[in-house]
Design a protein with these regions (language model features):
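DNA-recognition element of transcription regulators
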Residues: 52-53, 139
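Double-stranded beta-helix
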Residues: 78-100
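Hydrophobic alpha-helical core bundles mediating ligand binding, dimerization, or RNAP-core interactions
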Residues: 71, 101, 105-108, 138-149
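Ligand-binding loop in jelly-roll beta-barrel domains
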Residues: 56-84
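A general structural signal for short secondary-structure boundary/capping elements
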Residues: 96-100, 117-124
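Short, Lys/Arg-enriched, Trp-marked, Pro/Gly-tolerant hinge/linker segments that flank
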Residues: 116, 124-139, 146-171
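Generic protein-terminus/edge-of-domain signal
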Residues: 1-44, 50, 57, 65, ...
Length: 171
């Protein structure tokens, strides 16, 4: 279940007091930088950085006062053990993951009858009718995003400069 999808530009002095809830949430910085508290640790996130908040973890976010940051924030329920991969990690997204997030935002605009730039909005009403398949596409893009991250960080691809020599098949 997806609870919220937001894409917004904070003011350079924005401060969100913090919250905790019983579902997952992640923040990805599209531009600028923010300071994020999760539990007792504080981290500065810059463009391309991604951080997950596990269920019931207190977290807040504050603009650092420089460039007004643009953030993608998505909260969702997932009880799969694979989610433990994201505990206490700071990740950087690649171009594929950036495109998947962009696709989620596009589908959210087709699906939800509200602005995506209100960080305090809790309930996201559906459009009546929404674009065919928009909710399913959001779910698929989010699953693809999570799987891609786990695969990329678990099994980094090493590119060889030379292809190994092989004998042609014998006929």
């Amino acid at each position: 279940k997806i609870f919220s999808i937001h894409y917004f530009e904070y003011m350079s002095n924005f401060s969100f007091a913090g919250e905790s809830h019983n579902f997952w949430e992640f923040i990805c910085v599209d531009k600028g930088e923010v300071g994020v508290t999760r539990g007792k640790s504080y981290t500065i996130l810059k463009k391309g950085d991604l951080i997950f908040h596990k269920p019931n973890e207190f977290h807040d976010v504050k603009a650092t006062g420089g460039i007004a940051p643009n953030l993608v924030v998505i909260s969702f329920e997932c009880n799969d053990d694979a989610m433990y991969f994201f505990n206490d990690r700071l990740l950087q997204i690649d171009e594929t993951e950036r495109n998947l997030l962009a696709n989620i935002i596009i589908e959210a605009r087709r699906c939800f009858d509200c602005r995506l730039d209100d960080p305090y909005l809790q309930n996201m009403p559906l459009k009546d009718p929404d674009t065919f398949g928009a909710q399913q596409m959001i779910k698929l893009y989010l699953e693809h995003f999570l799987i891609h991250l786990i695969r990329r960080y678990s099994n980094p691809i090493v590119l060889s400069k030379k292809l190994p020599k092989a004998d042609p098949p014998k006929v």
